[in-house]
């Protein structure tokens, strides 16, 4: 019993922290990296597939002799399914070492703190998220170990989702262009940021397309991004100045001091008394000022639409539509001012009404002030809260308008059946206005109850309004605070031109290799192995098949080979780079093979019946250990860093 228990124990050294558990514990989550590691170890309790049911293989009749050792496999390419698991001394090719305590030890160069939660998931069936670990790091570790993120417990789901909410909020606010670094990369970065790198690449090698490729992003950034250069800041200040002048002019046009009353009375032929007609004209000085502003806005609009990287998106933008609608009436008004027909006067009257669109230019200030952008994003993010507030108000208005109508009719006189003499609430629709004014605590005083029952309803209406409005407001305020803090944090983010790349390993490093292929193989983040493993395949295969007579069990037939569930959601673009101990001719990989990333289906201990799904099937090999279980290996979803 002691020997069986020692063989069942396994030690996992993750980032220098040793964890000890049993193989049966690791097998509780089939299809994950540790389950593949536990299943790949040669043992007498290996499983075989008999139809759709997994059955244990019978124990060997007699202890087989110990086979010759396999050649060591470089770290990062382990046949037992450990990903970048490295062994402490070879022992039967299992990638682990016999520990003095009786277990086998495997090393993973991963985050030790997160692995404690991962291993606890195997033990208890409940996956919790550590509060002191950044969300992307925990997500990356879950992907490496092949665990569904949807298995996170509901109590920790908000903690796990916080980083995604923050990333989505940060993506909303555009950061200024990075300053410094290699000047040769400016054009490529600008083209990539503006989304025109593909179009620029198709321009051809001629000089015209080359000049356009250089000019387009510069001109677009000059009028679109105030932080791209000093000239862009000057353009932004000029645009801001003309916006403020235009709005000021629009407001002053309504003042009596700038309105000139002209007599437009026309003589009436064959008439006795002509009708006096007066028109109000705006001071010509304000008209000239507005004309200068419109000329600037026209120039800015034309430049932006010409150098826009995406004309369709430019036209669909709401601010650009407002800009165009605010510019067009001025030119139509100038063109029709010389006409005296009735139709022209009607059109001019309509255009004067459309002038109010100019006030919407104030929203163009959102390009220059972060607070206004934060306010806009807060309003969009709080749509559900605003909808909830409207529903609450609508319910309250309907209820209290009905109550005030009947409450005021209680004291009506017998000779006044409509109660119109002693109350202003003659019908329920009139009570809607009173209920809205009361619930929003405005209290104009134009309508008020006059009976004791009506006063009681009015008091209840005011209290309900205060409570109703106060409930969604904190959520909206919290959204504004979150967006504003994230916007400030992104503005203060250190400006980096290039991502840090770790240096190549030194000659004294255990992962040092002489070729680039082996460097990728020995990386702690890599599963690609294309180098010297080819020289070990024939040797290992010959060792595994050299003593076929020692095994008491026949090799598995193809239908009986053990399937291993894999998912199509993990790293589809690297299917052809997986490194197995056997060559590609010795196995058949399903078209959707890969460690599942865990975005499609939740998996827990209650809904796992065994290994199912698409299979990775290996050729039958009879082992001297009398166990026909094939060697299996999963690949890491994390690409190589070297």
From Swiss-Prot:
Disruption phenotype: Mice are healthy, grow normally, are fertile and show no evidence of severe sensory or motor abnormalities. Show increased seizure susceptibility and reduced long-range synchronization of gamma oscillations over distance in the neocortex. Thalamocortical neurons show a strong attenuation in maximal peak firing rates, with larger spikes and slower action potential repolarization. Neocortical GABAergic interneurons display broader spikes and sustain lower trains of high-frequency spikes without accommodation or spike doublets in rapid succession. CDD domains: BTB_KCNC2_4. Signal peptide: none annotated. A motif (Selectivity filter) lies at residues 441-446. Belongs to the potassium channel family. C (Shaw) (TC 1.A.1.2) subfamily. Kv3.2/KCNC2 sub-subfamily. Residues 45-98, 542-576 are annotated as: Disordered. The modification Phosphoserine is found at residue 604. Inhibited by millimolar levels of tetraethylammonium (TEA). Contrary to other channels, inhibited only by millimolar levels of 4-aminopyridine (4-AP). Inhibited by Stichodactyla helianthus peptide ShK. The keyword Zinc applies. It is found in: Cell membrane; Membrane; Perikaryon; Cell projection, Axon. The transmembrane segment S4 functions as a voltage-sensor and is characterized by a series of positively charged amino acids at every third position. Channel opening and closing is effected by a conformation change that affects the position and orientation of the voltage-sensor paddle formed by S3 and S4 within the membrane. A transmembrane electric field that is positive inside would push the positively charged S4 segment outwards, thereby opening the pore, while a field that is negative inside would pull the S4 segment inwards and close the pore. This is Voltage-gated potassium channel KCNC2. Residues 1-233, 308-317, 373-385, 478-642 are cytoplasmic. The keyword Cell membrane applies. K(+) binds at residues 441-444. It comes from Mus musculus (Mouse). It comes from the Eukaryota. GO terms for biological process: action potential; cellular response to ammonium ion; cellular response to nitric oxide; cellular response to toxic substance; globus pallidus development; membrane hyperpolarization; nitric oxide-cGMP-mediated signaling; optic nerve development. Homotetramer and heterotetramer with other channel-forming alpha subunits, such as KCNC1. Interacts with KCNC1. Homotetramer or heterotetramer channel activity is regulated by association with modulating ancillary subunits such as KCNE1, KCNE2 and KCNE3, creating a functionally diverse range of channel complexes. Interacts with KCNE1, KCNE2 and KCNE3. Its main location: membrane.
